[in-house]
Regions:
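Non-heme di-metal
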Residues: 1-288, 292-307
Length: 308
């Protein structure tokens, strides 16, 4: 799953490619529909980075349980492919690929040539979806399979979006010229909840007032199903606070004595005149509440259900 985060065709690459293409876009007003397309998809990719990281963190939760200094606390992970996740990463996601190679800015293609960049994006999504299917076939963890099912659907929308943009600019039907990868999402169980909600047909604007010209590019029939492509009325997909992963003392995350940090935080809140309980919600436990912690099995099942 790390490959889907920090690999050449991972979510870091899609996010940073589209982000810098939108940052560097010249004559934005004159070419608004295409700028709106890049900026909107870049915003969604930012969320995908968080989503992949959440899946990785869920998979690693419990893998390094134990007490520092006690024999065997990390014995079960010493033979893993990437021990850096436990030594340097706190049993969590790293900005690396599946073999520990760091993600690189060299993966970003932002030439300023709109047709060239859109063509690059089309094939970037092609490679990304290809890798997602391979990872799906390699994993059994339910959160990982739920993740890949979702990303296969949303990545397909982005691939179609870039194909439609190129067709509008050049007349070339990319989906007919390059019908790849052939991924039967209708036969993948983890894709079904998202397809039933129409997530394979719509793009989001991630803004109440901006990026409305996206509709000038993203329209017409879906090349595989014939259903109409639409810009969603809701500004973004429904989300939820991240899950409050339990402390992992063996890797000092968030420290060797997590309770001490909680006690210090409580005293600081009291000194600042804040309520006894933390204000707002930045995380929820496996039961969907904002208080308490969950064990590894609870986190795994709840993240799987939430992604689905």
């Amino acid at each position: 799953v790390q490959e889907l985060l920090g690999g050449k065709f991972g979510e870091m690459s899609t996010f940073m490619n589209y982000t810098y293409q939108s940052f560097n876009f010249r004559n934005r007003q004159g070419a608004r529909p295409f700028y709106d397309l890049l900026a909107s998809i870049a915003a969604e990719e930012f969320g995908h980075i968080e989503l992949v990281s959440a899946a990785i963190n869920t998979m690693l939760t419990g893998a390094a349980d134990g007490t520092p200094g006690e024999s065997g606390s990390l014995a079960d992970v010493k033979g893993t492919r990437n021990t850096q996740q436990f030594i340097a990463g706190g049993a969590s996601a790293l900005v690396q690929d599946s073999m520990g190679k760091p993600w690189s800015g060299d993966y970003v293609n932002a030439t300023g040539d709109l047709i060239g960049d859109l063509t690059h994006n089309f094939f970037l999504e092609t490679g990304a979806r290809n890798n997602k299917l391979k990872v799906y076939e390699m994993v059994e963890h339910p959160a990982a399979r739920a993740l890949t099912g979702y990303l296969l659907v949303r990545g397909g929308v982005h691939q179609v979006a870039y194909a439609r943009a190129l067709e509008n600019l050049t007349g070339a039907d990319m989906m007919k010229l390059f019908p790849s990868p052939r991924i039967p999402t209708d036969k993948i169980p983890e894709c079904q909840p998202h397809i039933k909600r129409g997530e394979h047909l719509k793009l989001y604007r991630f803004s109440q007032d901006d990026f409305k010209e996206l509709a000038a590019v993203f329209n017409g029939p879906h090349p595989e199903t014939g259903e109409p492509l639409t810009v969603a009325e809701e500004i973004h997909p429904e989300g939820a606070p991240a899950f409050d992963l339990p402390a992992q003392p063996a890797v000092f995350a968030p420290g060797p004595e997590p309770q001490e940090i909680e006690e210090i935080a409580a005293k600081l809140r009291e000194g600042a005149g804040l309520p006894k309980e933390p204000t707002g919600v930045v995380a929820q436990n496996a039961n969907g509440n904002s208080n308490g912690h969950a064990d590894a099995d609870d986190v795994m099942e709840t993240v799987k259900d939430a992604i689905s």
